[in-house]
Every structure is written in C-alpha cells, then in structure tokens.
Design a protein with these regions (language model features):
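Short, flexible beta-strand-to-coil junctions
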Residues: 10-12, 224-226, 263-265
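Short, solvent-exposed amphipathic alpha-helical segments in soluble enzyme
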Residues: 20-24, 44-45, 94, 156-158, ...
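Generic C-terminus detector
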Residues: 252-294
Length: 294
C-alpha cells in the first residue's frame, strides 16, 4: 500500500492542515518548524526537537521527512510545510508522489507581496519568489479573506485549473490537467508571450530584463538563446522584483520563448526583448566568425 502525501503550504498562519487531518480519519499530521539551534517536529501533536544537521535547517527537515515517510509507508500523511518552503522544491528533493498540494494565502495582501521586492530574513529569496512559487504549485488555493477581481485574474493565470475555496470549505482535490493559461486580458492582467528564432545580444538582453522588474510582473519564465552561449540555453525565472537567470541545459532548437504574467503593458515587454535581439548585420558577423572557427 502506497503512502499518500498531502502538502499544505503558505506563508500565512492558518489551521488548514489541521482541518484536512481531521477530515481524513487515520491520517498522520506532520509539521516542522525551524528554530535557531534545532528543528521542532510535530507528529499528530507530539513534539520532538531534532538537532540541526551541519547547521542547516532545510537539510534537517529533508532528511527527517525521508525517514518519517519511510516509517509511515501505507498511511496518509498531511504534511504542514514550514512557511518558507516551496512545495515543488520539497517534492523534487524527497522524490515522493503527492496527491494534492494545498496553498493558503492572504487574499488581501498576496498580490502586493507577489509584486514586491521585500527580502526574506532567512535566506536570499524575496517574499515574492516564495508566495508565487507556493501559489503556482497548488492544486487547491485556500483564500483567507476576500480577493479582488485582479488578484483572482492573476491566480487564474498563475495556477490555472486550481480549485479555490476558503479554510472552512477546504477539500483535497487534484487539479485538472492540462493547465492552460488564459491569454485574454482580464481586469488589467495580461499574458505577454515572446518568441524569437535569433539570439540575444548579451548586453542588450541585460537591459531588456529590466522590463520584468518594474513592479508590474508577477511571474515570468523563459528559455533564452544568447549569442555568446551558442550551445547552452539559459533559464529565466522572475517573481515580483526578484529574478534569476542560470544555465538551462543544451540549447537544442535555436529559439527563445518567454511568458510573463503582467499588470502592465505586455507590448512593452515584447518590445524590450525584440530590441535586444541581434540585428541582421550582427547575426551575419557572428555566423562568419563561427565559420572561421570551424
């Protein structure tokens, strides 16, 4: 009999994990909270302090969860994640099948957090990177308080197919697949889509990235072809005013694709990245250099 895992995430205080646990007789409620010198773990309300491994709270939680899930094989485990943890990151590191990811958010403040540049106290991430990653991983979004239409339109694009409910009506439900992001503008929320079949100029690309950091973009993702990296694609990801660009594996097809959820003008984003592409003269020069190298 396989272990069933339900993850409950969220940066806000909530009792949703307890509600899910109570609604599933025989399930086990697990929660970890990091402290300065240890990690406190609760299993069905019984607390245990665990010494930090190498001074790393996340490493300690990960290793303890591996052992716990092995010991609880065949059970339903309701995993109340530490507020700072992102469900997809936990799922990848643990290598477990998850029946449902439930994310709890403050409907009144979530969008401001998702657009902002506030930093987390505990690590190098921004608050936006945490709350956006938690929301987009959700099969079920639990809204504490009333959300305005603009927030709901953003969530429709960030987590399409996710079921929305309140803490009192929470259910464990796998979202429908495939998740198709709406492309039609709604309540001032748009989806910018940029594609190109020529590489970026590295310096101009750096300038174009600023179009994603003006406080109107909730989330962007992309796979970039840059002229000085002819064999490697770069992976782009931003949330609010936090951005990361890193190696994304072999280039494969020589194309660029960027998708951004924005409350601003999508045309300004596509225009900025269009201006960052190599011109015809630059492209001819690069091609001639490559031929000489061969």
């Amino acid at each position: 009999m396989e272990t069933v895992v339900v993850m409950v995430a969220g940066l806000v205080d909530h009792d949703v994990a307890v509600r899910v646990w109570r609604d599933r007789p025989g399930s086990v409620l697990v929660r970890h909270v990091a402290a300065e010198t240890c990690v406190r773990r609760w299993v069905d309300g019984v607390a245990t302090d665990i010494d930090l491994l190498h001074g790393c709270a996340s490493c300690t939680v990960r290793e303890d969860l591996r052992e716990l899930l092995a010991a609880l094989k065949g059970h339903t485990v309701v995993l109340h994640l530490d507020p700072l943890l992102e469900p997809d990151a936990v799922r990848r590191k643990l290598g477990v099948d998850v029946e449902c990811v439930i994310t709890v958010l403050d409907a009144a403040t979530w969008l401001d957090d998702a657009l902002g540049d506030a930093s987390m106290v505990s690590d190098q991430r921004t608050v936006a990177q945490v709350v956006v990653a938690q929301a987009e991983a959700a099969d079920v979004l639990v809204l504490q308080g009333d959300a305005d239409e603009r927030t709901l339109a953003v969530l429709d694009r960030l987590a399409p197919g996710a079921h929305r409910c309140t803490p009192e009506t929470v259910v464990v439900r796998k979202s429908t697949r495939p998740r198709l992001m709406p492309l039609t503008p709604e309540c001032g929320v748009s989806t910018a889509v940029f594609t190109a079949d020529r590489p970026f100029h590295p310096a101009r690309l750096n300038d174009a990235l600023d179009s994603l950091l003006d406080g109107t973009v909730v989330r962007s993702r992309g796979r970039l072809w840059v002229a000085d990296e002819p064999d490697v694609a770069l992976h782009l990801e931003s949330a609010g005013c936090g951005l990361h660009v890193g190696e994304g594996g072999p280039l494969g097809g020589r194309t660029t694709q960027i998708v951004a959820i924005t409350l601003g003008e999508p045309d300004s984003i596509t225009a900025a990245f269009t201006e960052a592409l190599l011109t015809d003269d630059e492209l001819s020069f690069v091609d001639s250099i490559r031929k000489l190298a061969i």
